[in-house]
Swiss-Prot record:
It is found in: Cytoplasm. SUPFAM superfamilies: S-adenosyl-L-methionine-dependent methyltransferases (SSF53335). This is Ribosomal protein L11 methyltransferase. Methylates ribosomal protein L11.
Length: 311
């Protein structure tokens, strides 16, 4: 079987939405070539465990690659992808060069091309993310292992926005807490909360592809008894009192439900937000404060920001 490798040269800000667009279009495997990963390995104790090849990374910007089957619908699929990516401009997302190229690869090349980019990654004091095909032995007795399949939708959990969220969850989720995960994507934040001994985790996403992906990942990590995922538009129709709400989505989306998040939290509960590009930090911070929150901490990694707020 023949596969097309779709390569998109873009910005850090656009990586996650473009990756999601590619998965929704039917991509089987997505690769992110980010030169900052090379710097991270040298500077950050939580960097890649394995050596990275600088020749695989661009000099500037980020390259997102996706693999699509060659069929009679390919041209139509690619046109749809281009149109949807261009629509991100409506959300003031910088697409950078937005240069798209297409090349053909065979079955064997496709099967191994994207796997070389993924290895076990320690992203916090407790959590290590491991691709499903890797054999990995925990280094510490209290290490928590999240298994992810990068061939499935919505990435592997090593993007800075996800790392910031998991590090925050590790600090603020207590045993017995009730947690909401808004815009769950892969479900990785719900998995982390469940492994941190939350009593219950309710994950929501409007996209049915994300819901199915999250459901599979919850099952893979054996936390389906604690965490459940449902299709829902943000926090619409959700009731009850919760200890932690986490949302790793675009800043523009977070702005839509800050008041709802406040009303659903117990007194003293925390709202962990991420997916916020640096220049939108102040806008989100002000919206949280206007909703009644107190800002506890603002964390940053590369171009991204996570804001932790308390009711």
């Amino acid at each position: 079987m023949k596969w097309s490798e779709l390569s998109i040269h873009t910005t850090h800000e656009a990586v996650e939405p473009i990756s999601n667009i590619l998965h929704e279009a039917g991509a089987s495997g997505v690769v992110i070539e980010d030169p900052l990963d090379l710097i991270k390995e040298r500077e950050n104790v939580y960097g890649e465990i394995y050596q990275l090849d600088p020749n695989d990374y661009p000099d500037e910007g980020v390259i997102v690659k996706a693999y699509l089957p060659v069929n009679s619908f390919l041209g139509e699929t690619v046109d749809g992808i281009k149109e949807t990516i261009n629509n991100l401009l409506l959300y003031n997302i910088d697409l950078g060069r937005n240069h798209i190229t297409i090349s053909e690869v065979n079955e064997e090349e496709w099967a191994t091309a994207w796997k070389k980019y993924y290895h076990p990654v320690k992203i916090s004091e407790k959590f290590t993310i491991v691709p499903t095909w890797e054999e990995y032995t925990p280094v510490h007795t209290d290490e928590l292992i999240i298994e992810m399949d990068p061939g499935m939708a919505f990435g592997t959990g090593t993007h800075p926005t996800t790392v910031l969220c998991i590090q925050a969850l590790e600090r603020f989720v207590q045993k017995g807490d009730k947690v909401i995960d808004v815009g769950t994507g892969s479900g990785i934040l719900s998995i982390a909360a469940a492994m941190l001994e939350a009593e219950s985790v309710h994950a929501y996403d409007l996209d049915p592809v994300a819901v199915e992906s999250a459901r599979l990942n919850l099952k893979l990590n054996k936390v389906s008894d604690i965490a459940q995922v449902k299709q829902n538009n943000l926090l619409d129709g959700i009731e009850g009192e919760h200890d932690v709400i986490v949302a790793n989505i675009l800043a523009e989306v977070i702005l839509r439900f800050t008041s709802q998040a406040y009303s659903l939290l117990k007194e003293g509960g925390h709202f962990i937000t991420s997916g916020i590009i640096g220049h939108k930090k102040q806008e989100v911070k002000e919206a949280l404060e206007q909703a009644g929150f107190t800002i506890v901490e603002i964390l940053s990694m590369e171009d991204w920001v996570s804001i932790i707020a308390k009711k």
